[in-house]
Every structure is written in C-alpha cells, then in structure tokens.
C-alpha cells in the first residue's frame, strides 16, 4: 500500500477596487532648467500609489514590479527611490503639463490612477541692482 501526500502553494488575492496616486509636489521644472536651482523648484517628485482591495485593505505599491508607470509626451523617467517611485522630468520636455498614469493588474483585476503635473520653465531673468540707499538704481555701461 502506498500513501502519497501533495501540497500546493497558492497565492490568493482579493480583487482590487481602486488606486490613488499622490506626490510630494505637483509643479516641476525640467532637469537641466536653471529653475531647478531656485528654492521650491524641483525636477523630480516622489510618487505614492495606494491600492485599495475588496476587503478594505489599503497598501502602497508604487515600488512593486506589477505596477507600471507612464508619462505623457515621453517627458520623464521613473525609478525606485526608497519607498517611493521617483519621477524626473526630462530636460527636453517642452510642455506646460504632463499626465502620469499608474496601472496595476492582479489576476483579472486592473486598477489605474492618473495625476497631472504642471511644468514650469525659467525663460528669462531680470535683475535690477540698487545702491545701499535702496532707492537709487545702479547703472553700468
């Protein structure tokens, strides 16, 4: 008489119901634009993709390989940065806004989220100098 035992390891997922995409900033400048040197202007943003499952569980999945990211106009790149997905705006980006989309597919369940980011370019800079009295403009030839 022979007795056989078999075991199967199966991963079960509850269906996903929604995804939200958030960021630490929503206004960016291209990576080589001089505006990146000014306070509060950055060429990158750290993204968080929070997924809600059918059972109510919410989890951040932005660095999970099953979540894919895309950006309109090919204006940026994505890379893992600690617990975030870092979006960096490409120096060749010549638009006033971009849309970032994250998509997660688990089994037959797919959720996606999109977020719009404003792009600013420093195109000109005007500097006016004054003497110490703060009322007489300095002029030089």
Predicted regions and their residues:
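Extracytoplasmic soluble-region selector
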Residues: 1-141
């Amino acid at each position: 008489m022979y007795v056989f035992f078999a075991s199967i390891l199966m991963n079960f997922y509850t269906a996903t119901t929604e995804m939200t995409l958030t960021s630490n900033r929503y206004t960016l400048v291209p990576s080589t634009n001089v505006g990146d040197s000014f306070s509060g202007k950055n060429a990158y943003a750290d993204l968080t993709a929070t997924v809600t499952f059918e059972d109510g569980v919410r989890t951040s999945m932005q660095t999970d390989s099953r979540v894919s990211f895309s950006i309109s106009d090919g204006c940026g790149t994505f890379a893992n940065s600690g617990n975030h997905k870092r979006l960096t705006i490409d120096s060749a980006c010549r638009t006033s806004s971009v849309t970032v989309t994250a998509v997660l597919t688990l089994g037959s369940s797919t959720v996606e989220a999109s977020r719009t980011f404003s792009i600013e370019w420093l195109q000109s800079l005007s500097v006016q100098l004054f003497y110490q009295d703060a009322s007489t403009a300095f002029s030089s030839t």
